[in-house]
Design a protein with these regions (language model features):
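Metal-dependent nuclease catalytic cores that hydrolyze phosphodiester bonds in DNA/RNA
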Residues: 1-145, 152-154, 165, 295
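Glutamate identity and glutamate-enriched acidic tracts
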Residues: 7, 18-19, 27, 89-90, ...
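Conserved active-site beta-strand-loop modules that form the wall/rim of enzyme catalytic pockets
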Residues: 142-148, 185-189
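A short mid-domain helix/strand-loop element embedded in enzyme catalytic domains
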Residues: 148-152, 193-194
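Active-site-adjacent loop/helix micro-motif of nuclease/hydrolase catalytic cores
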Residues: 154-160
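Metal-dependent nuclease catalytic regions and adjoining charged, substrate-binding loops involved
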Residues: 158, 165-172, 177, 181-280, ...
Length: 305
């Protein structure tokens, strides 16, 4: 399986930063970092949609539970800092590309962040950006997707050895869906080793069949009327199950958190809304109402079995 290293891009970034010893790079950082709103957002709201970044996860049951708010893990402070670092690193990636002479877009003409969605937004995500000027493309003027990721040392070394598709299949699924929905033929995947700041650049071509497979998977998970079969068939001792946020729900009959999404009366609607079919309510329910639930809550009968 070919790996299309974007060596010209990597070398150009290093060359341009070195030319003035990082002056222009730091200037861009000062402009870009304040725009990375996710890094400074104080809210801890629940994600109302199934994110594209998770669609390559091997366990469809886990995806169903995420979308249905079955559990809400409380992360250790170190993990929260790790998540935030990923957001902050996005600003550094963008500053690198701008320093190297790339054109970078993250918003449309109305100032809205580029997003892709299916089923009225039930399945979707914002993309990292679109770039023009990649010297590794046959036509550098062609607009392509860019996806930016941070890696620990072990993960980064595997990436160097095997390429993104093999070493990070969830990243591969994510960018395939993005490219397909955005009508882009390639993705510039940029990664950084958090240990020593080494960067890795690879071009990922669109595989429409793979993209369609994962889009279909996302839609099926969203519209599923009960939890799909997942890795839980392997048993509680399976390593991915032991680390899963929903292990207690799968193996130890832990009831789900109370919300409309775990209620027997709730229904997903293809237009991006949720509906309560309880005869007393019988209407569309807002996200705030879903979080709060109501006095008619009745746990869906597929939990605990």
């Amino acid at each position: 399986m070919p790996i299309y290293l974007a060596e010209k891009t990597k070398n150009l970034i290093d060359q341009k930063i070195e030319e003035d010893q990082g002056s222009k790079y730091r200037e861009w950082l000062g402009k870009v970092i304040p725009t990375i709103s996710d890094a400074f957002d104080p809210r801890n709201g629940r994600r109302s949609h199934l994110g594209v970044s998770t669609i390559g996860d091997p366990c469809a049951r886990k995806l169903f539970f995420q979308f249905r708010w079955v559990a809400r893990p409380k992360h250790h402070g170190r993990i929260i800092r790790l998540f935030n670092r990923g957001h902050m690193e996005e600003g550094r990636f963008i500053a690198m590309l701008l320093t190297a002479g790339f054109k970078v877009w993250q918003q449309d003409a109305e100032g809205n962040q580029f997003r892709i969605s299916e089923l009225g937004g039930h399945f979707g995500s914002a993309i990292d950006g679109i770039v023009v000027g990649c010297p590794d493309m046959p036509d550098p003027n062609q607009a392509i997707l860019t996806e930016m990721k941070t890696h620990g040392d072990k993960s980064f070394k595997k990436l160097l050895k095997d390429g993104m598709k093999v070493s990070k299949p969830m990243h591969y699924a994510q960018v395939q869906v993005y490219m397909r929905k955005m009508g882009l033929a390639a993705c510039l995947y940029i990664a950084v080793n958090k240990n020593d700041d080494e960067i890795y650049c690879e071009l990922i071509p669109l595989d429409a069949a793979v993209a369609d497979q994962f889009i279909d998977r996302g839609c099926k998970v969203v519209m599923a009327e009960e939890p799909p079969v997942g890795l839980s068939t392997k048993g509680a001792s399976w390593f991915e199950c032991k680390m899963c946020d929903f292990s207690d729900n799968c193996y130890r009959n832990e009831p789900p958190l109370v919300s409309c999404r775990t209620c027997s009366y709730s229904r997903v609607v293809e237009d991006g809304t949720w509906k309560c079919i309880n005869p007393v309510v019988n209407r569309t329910i807002t996200t705030d109402e879903q979080i709060a639930a109501c006095s008619h809550y009745e746990m869906a009968n597929y939990y605990g079995r």
